[in-house]
Amino acid sequence: MSNVKKIKGFADLFSPESDVFTFMENTARDVFSSYGYGELRTPILERTELFCRSIGTETDVVQKEMYTFPDRKNRSLTMRPEATAGVMRAYIEGSLHSQEQVSKLFTFGPMFRYERPQKGRMRQFHQINCECLGPQEPYADAEIILMLLMFLKRIGLSGLELQINSLGCRECRPQYHAALRAFLASLDTAELCEDCRRRMETNPLRVLDCKVPRCKELTADAPVILDHTCDACSEHHSVVLGMLERAGVVYTANPRLVRGLDYYNRTTFEVVCGEIGAQSSVAGGGRYDGLVSQLGGPDVPGIGFACGMERLALALEQKAQREVPRPDFLVAVLEQDGLERGMMLAEALRESGLKGEVSFAARSMKSQMRQAGKRNVRKVLLLGGSEIADGTVTVKDMDTGGQTTISLDAAPGAVAD
């Protein structure tokens, strides 16, 4: 019988890779809570209709990438391809709009898209999401971007590029659509990819999001959306940029930045890291003022972002800026009658706030020192025959090679030093 194997595009996360994910989540909790955000956990499974109505039926996500299936009552369900739609559903269903004027929420968890697996892009991937619902003022846009940048700085990333654009609103965007359609009609459309030819009719803005090199080349001179935004949208964008400049943030204006989901309006942004290759976007988001009402809720504006955790981990690996935490100790028991004492010593060390392991069987010094080196521990506490007889322990510093024999009571202080 053949071995059971994981599904293509899905990964097992072992330590230390999983430790990096935990580090990012804990850092995110610390940063986001300082801005007044609270954690929300939403289901992985949602009704397919939710994503069709929010993301847009003409997007690649809905057309090609969703894991969708009928349940036993023939209801169409989908494994979430992104988090915002589920947060909006929870916001509406939980009547959060009636409880507070501004709701600030963050989520962690796996998302699912049927794409070609490659470095930084898996079929199951993990995201950190933030959503701010209620304020329509541009200061909310600036704050959430500043919060994102603070989070990225706290996890050890620097030298990233913030790209920003405005997509206008439902009043002024039709004018841009008309100008864009006229431009696209002037091209030799036979040279565009099949998806772009379809998008020309259904949602021309999606053409600007195409990654096919020839399509990007043909649309290089497409009309710029900021030349077609209304006065209100232009003022909104100007205030956002002004706030970022006053905060000392360097950004790049990217008129082609439309994002891959239909619900965005006005501010859109991405953070890119060129060092991780083709999948260079590590975070992105924007404003979605009509999304809540589109899903049957009140007319509540909102803005949010998502970070791809696999891509963040890749960026951290490339920049090598994060030091992986080392275990404080390994209690190495060399004699069988020292196992109970070793267990109690390890518990005392953990009670004092230290982290480490204890051997469950008496093994040779060579074997346990090899384990200590593999674990990259700071100190090894040796319990051999003489230590067991004397009620002492020998502490070996793995960095300097020095060692000293002390009483068991003094062990926590010696390991902490």
UniProtKB/Swiss-Prot annotation:
GO terms for molecular function: ATP binding; histidine-tRNA ligase activity. SUPFAM superfamilies: Class II aaRS ABD-related, Class II aaRS and biotin synthetases. Keywords: Aminoacyl-tRNA synthetase, ATP-binding, Cytoplasm, Ligase, Nucleotide-binding, Protein biosynthesis. InterPro entries: aa-tRNA-synth_II, aa-tRNA-synth_II/BPL/LPL, Anticodon-bd, Anticodon-bd_dom_sf, His-tRNA-ligase, HisRS-like_core, HisRS/HisZ, HisRS_anticodon. One of its GO terms (biological process) is histidyl-tRNA aminoacylation. Its main location: cytoplasm. GO terms for cellular component: cytoplasm. It is found in: Cytoplasm. Its EC number is 6.1.1.21. It catalyses: tRNA(His) + L-histidine + ATP = L-histidyl-tRNA(His) + AMP + diphosphate + H(+). NCBIfam families: hisS. Homodimer. Belongs to the class-II aminoacyl-tRNA synthetase family. HAMAP family: His_tRNA_synth. PANTHER family: HISTIDINE--TRNA LIGASE, MITOCHONDRIAL-RELATED, HISTIDYL-TRNA SYNTHETASE. This is Histidine--tRNA ligase. It comes from Oleidesulfovibrio alaskensis (strain ATCC BAA-1058 / DSM 17464 / G20).
